[in-house]
Amino acid sequence: MKKLKILLSLLALAALTVFTIYHWVSYKAKHNLYENVTKIPKNKVGLLLGVNKFTYHGNVNLFYKYRLDAAVALFKAGKIEYILVSGDNSRENYDEPTNFKNDLIARGIPSDKIFLDFAGFRTLDSVIRAKEVFGQNEITVISQKFHNQRAIYIADHFNIKAIAFNAKPVKDRNVVILREYLARSKAFIDLIFNVQPKFLGEKITIQ
């Protein structure tokens, strides 16, 4: 019985820690989030965070669609000059950045205004590489609100001046939010231990 009480106490403490971190990240980011294109300040580069274009059932992923819509809206409103698409390209026939590039071009974004980061395996990699590889100390992150909050939190830790534009949310996202609780806790630990991207590499100039 004593061991059970200790186990339950540890589980309760872990749950409280995860809950606290989740809401701390939200609090830290709240003044840097925008949902109105007319109100968001201008930045040279918008960092479009990658996601799979299709769901497991073969339908277009709404997270993808709404991020694409958001990036196009910002560019056409003159709020960003370039779009840096950062995503995963680590598996055969899976290429988040190129999918976005093709669809951005189809929506009227000039190809020379789009840069691709194929080593954005996770949000931490994408944010740090935007600074260390692509030379951006100020960025506009483009994703859904919950994702933007974590990206802003990471950017702040690495002295990157970041704001974010919230893409349209997706309904029925309980599983995504549960994952976000864990992702924020992992990000918190990563920052404590100064975890760096899997790859850095040569500098790339956006111009």
What function would you assign to each model-found segment?
Residues 1-5, 174, 178-181:
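Structural motif marking the loop-to-transmembrane transition
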Residues 195-207:
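Short linear elements at protein peripheries
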Residues 1-38:
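N-terminal type II signal-anchor transmembrane helix
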Residues 1-8, 79, 204-207:
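Short, Lys/Arg-enriched, disordered terminal segments
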Residues 10-12, 74, 191-193:
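Enrichment for repetitive, rod-forming helical segments
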Residues 24-178:
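A structural signal for short, hydrophobic/glycine-enriched beta-strand patches
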Residues 177-196:
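A transmembrane-helix-recognition feature enriched in membrane-embedded lipid enzymes
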